[in-house]
């Protein structure tokens, strides 16, 4: 039976491989001990007030989809202790890096999920997020794989449902085709407004941006990034 309140799930995953290098024993232990304490339980209904998900008192809740090695998410959750953060990363080695960082510097305002981000989006209450970040997602270069790109009409509908009016959807990529793809999809979606006024609005990194390992590699290889910000109407 289809839930009429939420968009249908795509037939395929939006992410590629889930595992890379074998985990070290300490990393495996973190998956067994730390991740269960931080992982969202989607088997239970989401609280209407998401602030109750966190150990620390928070004022708003943001989400980062596909946080990679967790550089930005760990940085932001430390920089804004008054905000709650939900981080989603299905790639096991990326999650391992994040868990290692949290083992050294815990974040009581952070929860994690290691599977499909659309499951979290469909679990969240309406108008419950103050922002969604999607940085350097898999571009799925081949045309036949474009349907796997996370930016899609269905997922923008999901974003529109869970974002509060005035909340931001931020997208960064070093792949020009995916940047243009995202601009086209968001500008034709009734729920999102792109307010850029000059090239600096997409050429300059976000305020306080810490950079990521992937981004550094892209720059080293001669690629430039675009940093887009869309406002939920």
Swiss-Prot record:
S-adenosyl-L-methionine binds at residues 64, 89, 116, 138. Pfam families: Methyltransf_4 (PF02390). Its EC number is 2.1.1.33. It catalyses: guanosine(46) in tRNA + S-adenosyl-L-methionine = N(7)-methylguanosine(46) in tRNA + S-adenosyl-L-homocysteine. Pathway: tRNA modification; N(7)-methylguanine-tRNA biosynthesis. The keyword Transport does not apply. The keyword Transport does not apply. Keywords: Methyltransferase, S-adenosyl-L-methionine, Transferase, tRNA processing. The active site is at 138. Substrate binds at residues 142, 174, 212-215. InterPro entries: SAM-dependent_MTases_sf, tRNA_(Gua-N-7)_MeTrfase_Trmb, tRNA_methyltr_TrmB_bact. GO terms for molecular function: tRNA (guanine(46)-N7)-methyltransferase activity. Gene3D superfamilies: Vaccinia Virus protein VP39. GO terms for cellular component: tRNA methyltransferase complex. Residues 1-22 are annotated as: Disordered. SUPFAM superfamilies: S-adenosyl-L-methionine-dependent methyltransferases. It is an enzyme of class 2 (transferase). HAMAP family: tRNA_methyltr_TrmB. Belongs to the class I-like SAM-binding methyltransferase superfamily. TrmB family. Catalyzes the formation of N(7)-methylguanine at position 46 (m7G46) in tRNA. This is tRNA (guanine-N(7)-)-methyltransferase. It comes from Brucella abortus (strain 2308).
